[in-house]
């Protein structure tokens, strides 16, 4: 049926979209305070970008991407996440020539063929940040603190920050060998996905959601068991910086996240309010990704927050947003001979920065007043031919329940003085 939206998508309607606008404004304000500039990348990219950037063995690339061949016989994919596109833009536009670090943020829709459920859609929205050009553990702490700052400004409670270090190319081979040794006796009992991961990337077995695989891997070696001295020192410094700014965390040595590009710091923010241990955001460091995508060796770190999941968590916690609804002024006309003058007044109010509306259905004055009340309008300006000829209008303050005549010349000042 063509008149229904595709499964896993959602219409954000008036009355609901204001919450989104508040959230977007809040994140932009935080970005200004932290020194991040906005970047906007295409919604679709060449498929190879995600295969190389996200990782060919990830669930995203293997099962969840919306991929198609365009009329030029090119393989194109709707972006499933924002980091790979931002890295591509950094490399292609030679942003490495700018003073480093380069700090960017983005907001927009992402696409994954996933099983729709509460707070999880096939088209979903993310806010994310990326920092390129610094290996300083203080930057890791900054992006983590920034994510928590956003959640706290929204008013979210009962969040748990999980952090880990997933090592680097120096210490990963040791972990790979130990994991393969550990899982080898259990290989036939692992799920089919993890049997494939055993050879390609056994670290991903720790990320499996299968209860059987989780049970088997309960005593498996972890990244913290094999960190090289440099990675261990880096992780200790990240914790020190988080301690310095009062950010509480849980060391989770089983946290590896679902993307192959992470190195060293990985983190996730969890809540119980939208399901057991559900993630509402996370990120980490990816020091080899820019080089993998054709750029110079450049360290990077970032995070992404799921906007639908944030709004669902806020709803479950009873958080309300400061939303302004309806016009400040509604012009109610008396008689058909005043419509042209009312329309001119309407446009003048708008040019003065006042949100204003009028009737376009020929309603009676009583019906217009009732409609203005439904719009949650503060002032109703009642304009008739007699009042207009005298250069006045009757202004009713719907909040105070009072009305008075006001000169049309002073109408803007009258309204602005009371709002």
Swiss-Prot record:
Reactions mediated catalytically: tRNA(His) + L-histidine + ATP = L-histidyl-tRNA(His) + AMP + diphosphate + H(+)
EC number of this enzyme: 6.1.1.21
Biological process terms in GO annotation: histidyl-tRNA aminoacylation
PROSITE patterns: AA_TRNA_LIGASE_II
Cellular compartments annotated: Cytoplasm
Gene Ontology molecular-function annotations: ATP binding; catalytic activity, acting on a protein; histidine-tRNA ligase activity; transferase activity
Transmembrane segments: none
GO cellular component entries: cytoplasm
InterPro entries xrefs: aa-tRNA-synth_II, aa-tRNA-synth_II/BPL/LPL, Anticodon-bd, Anticodon-bd_dom_sf, His-tRNA-ligase, HisRS-like_core, HisRS/HisZ, HisRS_anticodon
Enzyme class: ligase
Record key words, sorted: Aminoacyl-tRNA synthetase, ATP-binding, Cytoplasm, Ligase, Nucleotide-binding, Protein biosynthesis
Summary of subunit composition and partner proteins: Homodimer.
PANTHER family: HISTIDINE--TRNA LIGASE, MITOCHONDRIAL-RELATED, HISTIDYL-TRNA SYNTHETASE
Family to which this protein belongs: Belongs to the class-II aminoacyl-tRNA synthetase family.
Protein name: Histidine--tRNA ligase
Species of provenance: Desulforamulus reducens (strain ATCC BAA-1160 / DSM 100696 / MI-1)
